[in-house]
């Protein structure tokens, strides 16, 4: 096969051939379907979670800053597995907002552009997170745990100020309901947290 039929538009980061009507661009500014959009978001999410930078960020939170106990049970990493949970926004929501912003402004992007910007938000502390016991983290994602907003670390307000306009109504409702949860109206207390409640 001849390689000289493959050409490149270096400025646009695009491959093409005079022999074929189709070209291939590194960056996109549209999706052909909702499933393609969600697949792209999930790919970004997986790439971020697998990255060295994400692991360094997580380890810095837990090992260096010593934020290494469950905010609910106060059990520490010496006793149990502790997760860092993105809370306002979720990682999926954060990625969606960045993609939606780019789509709305007709800015071309690729997976790596989105992942880099998300990691920059992590390193600027411009997102919310809490440390949770692994089983509490599962409980939250199963809809069985409320997290009071005063437990959240990081500048989650930055996200709301700068990216909420790029979210759909369902995402906004979810975030608003989470923002409204405090210690006086959540479904548990320190002496009666969900792990001890019969379900």
Regions found by a protein language model. Give the residues of each.
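A boundary/linker detector
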Residues: 1-69, 74-78, 167-199
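Histidine (H) residue identity feature
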Residues: 32, 60, 74, 85-87, ...
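Short, structured coil/loop segments at alpha-helix boundaries
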Residues: 50-51, 108-112, 133
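Generic detector of ordered, mature protein regions
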Residues: 53, 57, 95-102, 142, ...
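The −1 position to Zn-ligating cysteines in a subset of zinc-ribbon hairpins
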Residues: 69, 83, 132
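Histidine-centered nuclease catalytic patch
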Residues: 75-128
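A detector for short metal-coordination/catalytic motifs
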Residues: 122-128, 132-199
């Amino acid at each position: 096969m001849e390689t000289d039929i493959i050409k490149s538009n270096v400025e646009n980061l695009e491959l093409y051939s005079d022999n074929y009507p189709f070209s291939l661009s590194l960056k996109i500014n549209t999706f052909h379907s909702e499933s393609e959009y969600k697949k792209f978001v999930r790919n970004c999410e997986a790439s971020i979670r697998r990255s060295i930078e994400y692991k360094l960020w997580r380890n810095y939170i837990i090992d260096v800053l010593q934020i290494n106990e469950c905010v609910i049970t106060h059990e520490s990493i010496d006793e149990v597995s502790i997760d860092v949970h993105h809370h306002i926004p979720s990682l999926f929501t954060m990625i969606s907002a960045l993609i939606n912003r780019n789509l709305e402004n007709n800015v071309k992007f690729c997976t790596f552009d989105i992942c880099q910007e998300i990691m920059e938000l992590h390193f600027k502390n411009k997102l919310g997170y809490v440390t949770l016991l692994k089983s509490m983290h599962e409980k939250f994602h199963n809809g069985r745990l409320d997290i009071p907003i005063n437990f959240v670390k990081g500048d989650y307000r930055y996200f709301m100020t700068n990216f909420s306009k790029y979210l759909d109504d369902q995402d906004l409702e979810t975030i608003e309901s989470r923002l409204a949860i405090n210690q006086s109206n959540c479904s548990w207390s320190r002496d009666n947290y969900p792990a001890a409640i019969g379900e």
